[in-house]
């Protein structure tokens, strides 16, 4: 499996992705907002975009669909419940489905509600594994639930799906928010040495060659995976004094999401 992470350099700080089969040169475009860059990259690599995959329905992820399809005649894949939100879906996908790219790439579909209720991620059981997670999971962060989402569903997605993936899974999110998200981690957990070290590293990074984290690292630097951390809970109680002495993980997650909305 060949992966191209494409930095759009737009105000929303989007990443687009191309996944290609090395045998056939067929490629899948994920959330190809910057259709010109996606098409140019595919051409430069000698790839043919045969499928387009939308993680969810928001315009900064679907905005390049029509231009890509017009150029490639590629088939559009998205959540089976998003047909009224994304125009021109050719194949509606559900949890457990497989997206095949060429002969050698098979991606497992994960139904990951939270950011929206029709959000999908793609998991590649490659070596190492990879997760293309749209706006569900960010480096050191979690998607918001402002526009059609539900934080309760997002909690379930994190704890019942994402946290159970292999620890060496490489994380490919839909946006580049790592510096700001690490700032939130350190606001909540000021003694997190790994977050401090990584923040110093990524402050000077070129998003065209962005840092790629793993699930193991996310569990060390991402507050939304660190729901039983004593420092984090003590800090949370400063804002929410009625928090139980030993709060349940869901309560911690929801309070963190509430704080992050305003941070």
From Swiss-Prot:
UniProt KW Amino-acid biosynthesis keyword: no
Domain of life: Bacteria
Binding site for Zn(2+) 1: 56, 58, 115, 135
SUPFAM superfamilies, per database record: Metallo-hydrolase/oxidoreductase
Cofactor requirements of the protein: Zn(2+)
GO terms of molecular function: hydroxyacylglutathione hydrolase activity; metal ion binding
E.C. code: 3.1.2.6
Group of enzyme by EC: hydrolase
Gene Ontology terms describing biological process: methylglyoxal catabolic process to D-lactate via S-lactoyl-glutathione
Subunit-structure text: Monomer.
Family of this protein: Belongs to the metallo-beta-lactamase superfamily. Glyoxalase II family.
Descriptive protein name: Hydroxyacylglutathione hydrolase
Organism: Nitrosococcus oceani (strain ATCC 19707 / BCRC 17464 / JCM 30415 / NCIMB 11848 / C-107)
